[in-house]
Design a protein with these regions (language model features):
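Membrane-permeabilization and membrane-interfacing ectodomains
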Residues: 1-357, 362, 395, 442
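Lectin-type carbohydrate-recognition ectodomains
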Residues: 135, 556-559, 579-580, 611-614, ...
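Long, compositionally biased eukaryotic scaffolding/regulatory segments
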Residues: 297-300, 304-541, 566
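Pro/Thr/Ser/Gly-rich low-complexity, intrinsically disordered linker/stalk tracts
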Residues: 521-552, 613-625
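Extracellular low-complexity, O-glycosylation-prone stalks/linkers
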Residues: 541-585, 602, 609-615
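Exposed aromatic-hydrophobic patches
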Residues: 585-591, 661, 711
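Beta-strand-rich modules
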Residues: 588-607
């Protein structure tokens, strides 16, 4: 196979002239006593050499060979790393199989990113100092020919290029709010600028404040052949070291290490010597590299998922991820050992390349192929993101495991526990079961390449079910409103988040615990009620119509009101006063005539109270209502004014658009029509037909351009005694009461 000398990268291995080298294993032998380890066998061979020490010292040619190099790389792939170190395809295969133990600067090959959020740029510095080689005349004078009969080596080192290399690996993590591409570009610019920065007096570096701020978030990992008192860990430390690197080897030339070696085939010296029968094809090596890169991506994704708070918050999700990681780790190790087992056998002629192809086929057909691994990780990520989205708005509420929940339930100072419970986190994962089953199969243990595929049962994940998601959203809305807006200051009520397996309530449910016992597994807290209807306003009283809400059990109402001062704005002024009532029809009394009041109410359930309704504003007065006028202040505010100054308002923001309807004392409304907008989600227009004393009719209307179908209103006698509206950011409902 290799019938002529060739060169190979040292990779931090102590390779020196006259050392024996085995290309089957890609290992070297010391001239006296050496040990090498295979997958299953450990061999100890002593006293192996071709020449004595005296001959070697007399026939070694040494001369200076000075060269420096500086390169940058933004890639973390093994291919780009191998290119920087000038690693051959064959040596790369041995590294992937774990047959080569690297050292010094070559440890860079083992340094891979641990997270997808990690941006990385590498600076590579190299210099060579001298070149040593055995003279060709000495090669023919073999003093110990018995080495050829032992067949433990295939080559001998005839020349070594010495020097030193260094890799400075710069990393920067990007947060969820930062774009990784921007961080990567910023890091790349700063690393490439590093050689150009100058260090001035007292060690200060000439750079802008923005550049200094960027460097604060950059970390550095050093892999090198230089002897340092301390490795750099920051950008600034790396900058200082870079300025010193050219002097380190110059001042201490004895510290140079092998960078590259030249190997001479032993069978050219004696036909009986072992030789490299065949080499692994480049395409197969490329396939091995692709598989290992894919498994590395899987490992990074696992690391990112394990850092998500939700993983540790819920034991079921944590156990599934750990199970996946354990199975994955075992498989990756055994796969690597399988590759390591067949490589030497193929190179030595004991096996054909087909044995390696079979291992790769076995991988592609296994449940550990990249597509299946990534699909499971995608599902796991979806589940965790769903949990995170449901808890991030509830940061003030603790997430409790079963022990924490029991501790709270046993607390004598807590009467009621309201728990947002995730009910579907505990389940049997068929894919994880398949992974475990595959790892215990005979075919996996043998890894003989026979195609063996375990079927993975397809199952619909609970977190991909739209009906379940809809229910979870509703539960979250009820729970959040019940806690954040209404009852967070209630000392006797504790709000928590937990997980309890409950197939009857998939997704989530609100659990109610009273006196330490579960009393309702589908608790529906009282929700925000509709706007109160103002039925009548007199000098010191306001009559209200309160409305039940379908969500939750209504026990009482709590009517809240306060006076609004002229200079205080709508939401300011005095504190809210409140009165409890059991009746839907309720009259506020002892109000001051002529002053404006804001009124709202809450529904009181058996546990806690609801969020407050939207407010209505009214001004008690002793005079009759008289003539009225309807005014739209904006799309989300309506006011009704009466001739005596009385006013009723729906909505809360004043604006510029305005339309006024003026009615006289004896005017009668003959017909009324309302229109929704074209989207059917807002009030789009209204029209009144008015008849005066002389039976003359006129039309008063305000309409948007795009309308839906009209809705006719029964005006009965033509006298309007009430207006009802509902608003949020806009008026979305409007109605009139006629008698």
């Amino acid at each position: 196979m290799e019938s002529k000398p060739f060169e190979v990268t040292a990779l931090g291995r102590p390779l020196f002239p006259a050392m024996l080298y085995c290309c089957h294993w890609r290992i070297y032998f010391k001239s006296a006593l050496f040990v090498y380890t295979t997958v299953k066998v450990t061999l100890v061979i002593s006293g192996v050499t071709l020449w004595d020490k005296k001959s070697l010292s007399e026939d070694l040619d040494s001369h200076h060979q000075l060269l420096t190099d500086l390169k940058f790389s933004s890639s973390d792939s093994l291919s780009s790393k191998s290119s920087l170190l000038d690693v051959s395809a064959s040596l790369k295969a041995s590294f992937l199989g774990g047959l080569v133990e690297v050292g010094g600067s070559a440890k860079y090959l083992c340094d891979t990113k641990s997270s997808h959020q990690q941006s990385r740029v590498t600076m590579y510095y190299s210099e060579t100092s001298r070149f040593d080689q055995l003279t060709m005349t000495k090669l023919g004078h073999i003093i110990y020919p018995q080495v050829f009969h032992q067949k433990t080596a295939t080559h001998v080192v005839t020349a070594v290029l010495y020097g030193a290399q260094a890799f400075m690996v710069f990393d920067q993590m990007s947060s969820k709010d930062e774009k990784k591409q921007e961080i990567q570009g910023q890091l790349d610019v700063m690393v490439r600028k590093l050689p150009g920065f100058s260090i001035e007096g007292q060690g200060s570096v000439k750079m802008t404040e923005d550049e200094k701020k960027i460097t604060e978030n950059i970390t550095c990992i050093f892999h090198g052949d230089f002897h340092l008192e301390q490795n750099p860990t920051t950008y600034m430390e790396a900058l200082n070291l870079y300025k010193l690197l050219p002097t380190l080897l110059k001042e201490n030339p004895q510290n140079a290490v092998p960078i590259k070696v030249w190997l001479y085939p032993l069978h050219l010296l004696d036909i009986k010597a072992a030789q490299l029968e065949r080499e692994i094809s480049t395409s197969l090596i490329s396939n091995i590299e692709d598989i290992m890169e894919e498994l590395g991506e899987v490992e990074r994704t696992c690391n990112d998922l394990s850092r998500i708070t939700m993983v540790n918050a819920f034991s079921d999700t944590e156990e599934r991820l750990h199970s996946f990681q354990d199975s994955f780790s075992i498989y990756k190790t055994v796969l690597q050992k399988a590759v390591a087992r067949v490589l030497p056998a193929i190179r030595g002629g004991g096996e054909k390349e087909q044995s390696l192809e079979d291992i790769l086929k076995n991988h592609y057909s296994s449940p550990f192929n990249a597509d299946k691994l990534n699909q499971w990780l995608h599902d796991a990520k979806s589940e965790l993101h769903l949990l995170n989205s449901h808890t991030k708005t509830l940061e003030k509420i603790g997430i409790e495991d079963s022990d924490g929940l029991n501790t709270i339930l046993l607390d004598p100072d807590i009467d009621v526990v309201v728990c947002l419970t995730f009910t579907s986190l505990k389940y049997e994962d068929p894919y994880l079961s398949t992974l475990k089953k595959f790892l215990t199969s005979d075919k996996f243990k043998e890894l003989d390449g026979n195609k063996y595929e375990l079927s993975v049962a397809s199952d619909k994940k609970w977190f991909n079910n739209p009906d379940v998601i809809k229910t979870m959203r509703e539960n979250l809305s009820h729970f959040r409103g019940f806690f954040l807006e209404a009852n967070k200051d209630e000392k006797r009520i504790s709000f928590i988040i937990s997980a309890v397996s409950d197939p009857s309530n998939p997704g989530s449910s609100i659990y109610l615990y009273e006196k330490g016992k579960l009393t309702d597994a589908q608790f529906e807290p009282v929700s925000k009620p509709p706007l109160p209807l103002v039925k009548n306003v007199l000098e010191q009283t306001v009559s209200l119509k309160l409305q039940k809400y379908p969500s939750g059990e209504t026990v009482q109402y709590r009517v809240e009101y306060k006076e609004v001062k002229a200079d205080s704005g709508a939401e300011k002024g005095k504190e809210w006063l409140f009165i409890y009532t059991d009746h839907e029809d309720f009259t506020l009394t002892e109000l001051e005539s002529g002053k404006e009041y804001m009124i709202r109410y809450r529904v009181v359930g058996k546990v806690g109270v609801s969020e407050p309704s939207d407010t209505v504003s009214t001004r008690p007065s002793s005079a009759a209502f008289g003539r009225s006028a309807l005014r739209t202040m904006t799309l989300n505010t309506i006011q009704v004014f009466f001739s005596n100054g009385h006013m009723v308002k729906v909505g809360n923001v004043a604006g510029s658009k305005e339309q006024t309807f003026q009615l006289k004392e004896n005017d009668k409304i003959v017909s009324a029509t309302l229109w929704p907008n074209h989207l059917l989600n807002r009030c789009g227009g209204l029209e009144f037909v008015i008849a005066n004393n002389n039976s003359e009719k006129m039309s008063l209307s305000v309409k948007c351009e795009l309308l839906g179908e009209p809705v006719r209103v029964d005006v009965k006698s033509g006298k309007c005694y009430g207006i009802k509206g509902r608003s949020g950011h806009e008026i979305d409902a409007l109605g009139f009461y006629f008698i």
